[in-house]
């Protein structure tokens, strides 16, 4: 039976966490290794709820760490499964054995909790897993999500499924389509990255982000040594583009197996309200550089994240031996994001000193049509087809 590793970042989600975790521990597929990563939550109960479930279900390992953002939390789980952590027993408390990271600790993990009844000896070792999947802690799965994925993962690098958007009260439902709907995949199929790039071109989309939208073959992920870029937003663009550029087979599963909650006080901040609560601890220096003007700091972070993302992608493509799949991904997607990154030149204050890096990006910008133009051309094409 294949083993599925699950990584769930947790940050101030006491209102949503139980529903999320119930959808995990009650999956019809049971051979799971569940990693909860408390990313420095400051609310009253997120960590306590995580501990409650870690005692309830022996498949759960709980990491408590410094606030570092979504990328850092996910990377904690990835690094654990990559077996990069050497752990030492710390103590026994409240039904747990606790451990610390004894070697390099890039995500600043404070403590690792595991139900003491799991152990014969006081040693915590990372399990071997076959597949990896992410879940955000304010979202949830259909109870057959993992089962539906696993039975399709044979010789597949990435499985991509559809999701259902659930709007929290006060958030406007604008009837937005999911990427699966935009790409018009209605039947299950296996594609390659070149096929994906071609379909993106046809529908006028440049969305290649990937994090919680499917399952990844773990040996494939480990082979390409991919992690998320820390301390940026929209981190799933970099992750997704490298993932797809490195893959051979992608399974398209147009089933809505994931429930995505759109709420205001989150990293993605779908209702565009910006408050001090949206600026996380790890953005503190930027926040202070803008005299605690949350709106300006968040706008700078948004633009800076684009630049950092594209610079990392350029490094990747320049260091990769090109094939027709990676070439298609690079040529269709990189110019679009490079062009967006160059909008950074309009910023007046630059605490990260990124303006000097823009010259590295300019050669990758081509004459590309804006997204609206692609939609218009597609409509014209449909009229005359």
Show where each model-derived region lies.
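Alpha-helical repeat scaffolds in large eukaryotic proteins
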Residues: 82, 314-318, 342
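Short, flexible/disordered intra-domain loops and linkers
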Residues: 171-175, 294, 365-368
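Residues that form generic nucleotide/phosphate-binding pockets
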Residues: 53, 200, 316, 364, ...
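Inter-helical turn/loop segments and adjacent helix faces that build the functional surface
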Residues: 228-229, 320-324
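P-loop NTPase catalytic cores that bind/hydrolyze ATP
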Residues: 237-245, 307-311, 335-339
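Nucleotide-sugar donor-binding/catalytic module of glycosyltransferases
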Residues: 1-284
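Catalytic core of nucleotide-sugar-dependent glycosyltransferases
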Residues: 258-263, 269-322
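Membrane-interface aromatic/basic loop that binds lipid-linked glycans or pyrophosphate carriers
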Residues: 156, 323-385
């Amino acid at each position: 039976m294949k083993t599925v590793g699950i990584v769930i970042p947790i940050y101030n989600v006491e209102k949503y966490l139980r529903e999320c975790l119930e959808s995990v521990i009650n999956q019809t597929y049971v051979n799971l290794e569940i990693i909860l990563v408390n990313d420095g939550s400051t609310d009253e109960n997120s960590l306590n709820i995580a501990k409650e479930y870690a005692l309830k279900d022996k498949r759960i390992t709980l990491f408590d760490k410094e606030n570092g953002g979504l990328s850092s939390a996910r990377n904690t789980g990835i690094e654990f499964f990559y077996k990069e952590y050497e752990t030492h027993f710390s103590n026994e408390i409240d039904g747990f054995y606790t451990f610390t990271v004894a070697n390099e600790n890039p995500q600043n993990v404070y403590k690792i909790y595991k139900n003491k009844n799991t152990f014969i000896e006081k040693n915590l070792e990372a399990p071997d897993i076959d597949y990896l999947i992410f879940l955000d802690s304010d979202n949830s799965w259909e109870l057959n999500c993992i089962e539906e994925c696993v039975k399709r993962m044979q010789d597949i690098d990435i499985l991509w499924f559809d999701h259902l958007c659930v709007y929290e009260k006060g958030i406007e439902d604008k009837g937005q389509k999911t990427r699966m709907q935009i790409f018009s995949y209605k039947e299950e199929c296996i594609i390659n990255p070149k096929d994906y790039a071609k379909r993106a071109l046809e529908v006028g989309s440049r969305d290649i982000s990937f994090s919680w939208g499917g399952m990844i073959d773990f040996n494939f992920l480990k082979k390409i040594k991919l992690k998320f870029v820390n301390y940026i937003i929209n981190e799933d663009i970099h992750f997704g583009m490298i993932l797809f550029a490195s893959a051979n087979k992608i399974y398209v599963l147009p089933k809505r197996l994931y429930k995505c909650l759109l709420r205001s006080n989150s990293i993605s901040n779908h209702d565009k309200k910006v408050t001090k609560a949206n600026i996380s601890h790890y953005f503190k220096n930027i926040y202070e550089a803008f005299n605690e003007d949350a709106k300006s700091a968040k706008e700078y972070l948004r633009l800076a994240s684009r630049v950092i993302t594209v610079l990392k992608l350029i490094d990747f493509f320049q260091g990769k031996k090109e094939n027709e799949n990676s070439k298609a991904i690079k040529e269709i997607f990189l110019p679009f994001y490079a062009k967006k990154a160059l909008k950074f030149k309009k910023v007046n204050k630059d605490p990260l000193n990124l303006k000097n890096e823009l010259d590295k990006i300019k050669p990758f910008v081509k004459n590309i049509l804006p997204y609206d133009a692609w939609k218009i051309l597609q409509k014209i094409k449909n009229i005359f087809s």
